[in-house]
Every structure is written in C-alpha cells, then in structure tokens.
C-alpha cells in the first residue's frame, strides 16, 4: 500500500512538472506576444494575483484583471507556477487550449511561494482603483488578494487587445466558425445564455420582445441558445411567442463554455443574459461580435441569492437592463 501511494504521488508530481515545463516552453516560443510590458529584468517591479480556479468566466475575470492592473501600475504580471498545482491544472484545461494568447501576456515563473501582502476589492466592493491603492507603493513585488475581481473596470483599458487575443488560436476559431453552415454565417444573430437558474417564463417573454424589435430591422434573424439544459432550449424554441417570428434556430448545447465565448466573439450581434451574474454569460456579452453589439440582462434584483458583485462595477453602462415586469 505504501509503495502504491508513493508511486501515485510520484506520478502526480511528474505530471505537474511536465505541465509547468510545457507552459514555459510554449510561452517562450512567443516572445513577441509579451511586448506590452517590455522586457523583464530583476529590477522591474512585479505584481502577482491570487487567482481563481473556478469556471472559465471566473478565470477570465481573474487573469484579465491581473493584466489590466499590471498595465495601470506599470508592473510585470507574474504567475508563479511553483507550489501552485491546482492553478496550473486549471489553466491547462481551458485557458492554455483555447486562449493561449492571454497566458502569453504573463511572465510564468518558478520561484518560492509569495505571501499575500496587498488586497484589492475586498470589503463588499467589486472594484477599487488600483492607482489610488498602489501608485505610491514602492515594493518590488506585490501579491494581491481580491474577491474575484468581478469588474470590467480593472481591464477595460485592454478591451481591444482582449478581443484580439480570444481569436488568436486558429484551430479554436475554425471550430467555432464551423458550428453553423456557411449560409447561416451572414444572418443577424441573437444569442441567449441560460443556466439552471434561468426563469423560462420570464425568459421567453423577454426573448419575444427582443425578436419583435430586431425582426423588424433585419430580414434574416437567427436565434441561438447557449445552455447545457435541453429542456430550456426546447421550451424556448417551441413556445408560441417565439414561433410566430420567422427565425432560424440553433443550439450550442454541445459546445464548451469557452467555445461559446469564441462563437459569441465571431457571430453574436445581440446577447441576452437570462442570469445576469453568470460570468460565462457575461463574457459572451463583453466579447460579442462588435464593439457596439447590444447586450441585455435581466434585472439582478430578480436573483438576490446570486449577487456576487456590485451592479455599477459589474455591468458596463452601455448594457441594457430588462425589468422583471416585462410582458
């Protein structure tokens, strides 16, 4: 038994080391991708974040907030891969596969663990101005702890770059493009994101209103549902409020959350979040097809138990909030 446990532990250590080495090799192959922060030297100040290992939406908030704050403070963004196996495993599963250009913006280091020495957005606040908190901080290295960094304000200064980074993996882009036929690619696409918490009856009323508006403006409208629950999709597609509009219908049920985000970046002209605090849905809206793509979300007060961020910090001001009283 002792030998078997030791062999299992050895195998896991070898696996983790292999992942770290692979990340370092891949990132080293793309030195031109990290010119945003200049060449790193030991004299430059660095910043590390205590990163989320949750779903892809949480990971994006954490990583991109790290990058945005680093740029604001003129510090090098560092991810320490040593003694951080859970984070490395998480990044390897989705970020490394689908969004490698985002990881290429970081310096991936193997160094002794760094203790948390700063906090940002902790006390019931999604956003705190990093300049106000850290601009006079002369420490060579900051290790920042937060509450998930769920605010676009941390990284909105990088939005144009982020929109490019999510499209830089050619294989992922091709996979997303091929989810629909060539004849459907020029349709005007309304993308609806749903979760287990989505209210079917409220959602169908809102979708009907959205369809009523856009089918009067565009001839070829396509309704796309991004939900892992076939019951929700079936309810929407077969409902009489929806069927009266002439639209093509498509489900992304077989696509991973990260693939749905890439699909939204390529195709979604309109995004509707039926559960406003879903970080996966949020990124579908933030990275929709165009800078001026319309994003709608239900009033967060409909979901008091799901509140994870301040509304003013979480939702960009251009997004449109839909009332619970929608008819």
UniProtKB/Swiss-Prot annotation:
Name assigned to this protein: Uncharacterized protein T25D10.1
Protein location: Membrane
Transmembrane recorded as keyword: yes
Upper taxonomic lineage: Eukaryota, Metazoa, Ecdysozoa, Nematoda, Chromadorea
Gene Ontology cellular component annotations, sorted alphabetically: membrane
InterPro entries in the record: Alpha-1-2_FucT (IPR052501)
GO terms for biological process, alphabetical: innate immune response; macromolecule glycosylation
Membrane topology: Single-pass membrane protein
Keyword line: Membrane, Transmembrane, Transmembrane helix
Transmembrane regions: 13-33
Highest taxon of source: Eukaryota
């Amino acid at each position: 038994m002792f030998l078997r446990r030791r062999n299992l532990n050895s195998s896991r250590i070898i696996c983790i080391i292999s992942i770290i080495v692979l990340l370092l090799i891949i990132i080293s192959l793309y030195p031109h991708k990290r010119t945003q922060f200049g060449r790193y030297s030991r004299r430059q100040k660095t910043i590390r974040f205590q990163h989320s290992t949750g779903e892809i939406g949480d990971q994006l908030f954490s990583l991109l907030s790290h990058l945005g704050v680093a740029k604001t403070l003129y510090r090098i963004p560092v991810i320490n891969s040593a003694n951080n196996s859970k984070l490395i495993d998480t990044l390897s599963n989705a970020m490394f596969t689908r969004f490698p250009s985002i990881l290429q913006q970081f310096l991936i280091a193997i160094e002794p663990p760094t203790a948390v020495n700063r906090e940002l957005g902790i006390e019931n606040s999604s956003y705190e101005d990093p300049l106000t908190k850290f601009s006079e901080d002369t420490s060579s290295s900051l290790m920042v702890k937060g509450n998930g960094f769920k605010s676009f304000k941390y990284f909105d200064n990088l939005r144009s770059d982020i929109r490019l980074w999510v499209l830089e993996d050619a294989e992922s882009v091709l996979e997303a493009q091929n989810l629909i036929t060539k004849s459907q690619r020029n349709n005007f696409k309304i993308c609806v994101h749903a979760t287990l918490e989505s209210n079917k009856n409220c959602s169908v009323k809102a979708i009907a209103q959205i369809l009523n508006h856009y089918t009067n403006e565009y001839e070829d409208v396509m309704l796309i549902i991004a939900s892992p629950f076939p019951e929700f999709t079936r309810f929407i597609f077969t409902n009489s409020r929806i069927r009266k509009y002439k639209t093509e219908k498509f489900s992304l049920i077989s696509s991973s959350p990260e693939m749905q985000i890439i699909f939204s970046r390529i195709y979604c002209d309109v995004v509707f979040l039926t559960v406003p605090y879903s970080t996966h849905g949020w990124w579908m809206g933030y990275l929709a097809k165009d800078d001026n793509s319309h994003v709608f979300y239900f009033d967060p007060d409909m979901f008091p138990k799901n509140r994870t961020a301040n509304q003013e910090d979480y939702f960009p001001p251009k997004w449109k909030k839909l009332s619970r009283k929608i008819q």
